[in-house]
Amino acid sequence: MKSAGVYPASNQEIYSGLVRIHILYHACQGPIFGLGMIEELRRHGYRLSAGTLYPLLHGLETKGYLRSREVRSGRTFRRFYRATAAGHKALALAREKVKELVGELLEDD
């Protein structure tokens, strides 16, 4: 995951998982598109390029968590992604795991 120097390279795999959860969350809320997700993730402190985000989106689609379709926008096309039933189920499971983890992390404080 390319992060423009914000995170050490050794943490990229960890942050990649968090980014995937963010993507699933927003795709469960409604249709998302690449640039919109880059901007949304930036609000949370992630610095992703299109070259990093699109492979993540395509990977989630290949695994059946997202479905996409192209929509014409003027002279160009924009690909929108939505969560599938499997994506909703995966997010529900991730939510439970994150709750459990946050509970453990906060116990140590």
What are the residue ranges of the model-derived segments?
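Short, Lys/Arg-enriched N-terminal segment that forms or immediately precedes the first helix
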Residues: M1-Q12
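Basic amphipathic alpha-helical segments that dock to polyanions
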Residues: L53-P55, G59-L60
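Basic, amphipathic "hinge/linker" alpha-helix immediately C-terminal to the N-terminal HTH DNA-binding motif
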Residues: F77-R95
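Amphipathic alpha-helical dimerization/coiled-coil segments
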Residues: L91-D109
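N-terminal helix-turn-helix DNA-binding core of bacterial DNA-binding proteins
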Residues: N11-T52
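Beta-hairpin "wing" of winged helix-turn-helix
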Residues: K63-G74, R82
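Histidine- and aromatic-rich ligand-binding microenvironments
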Residues: E70, R75-R78, K99-V102
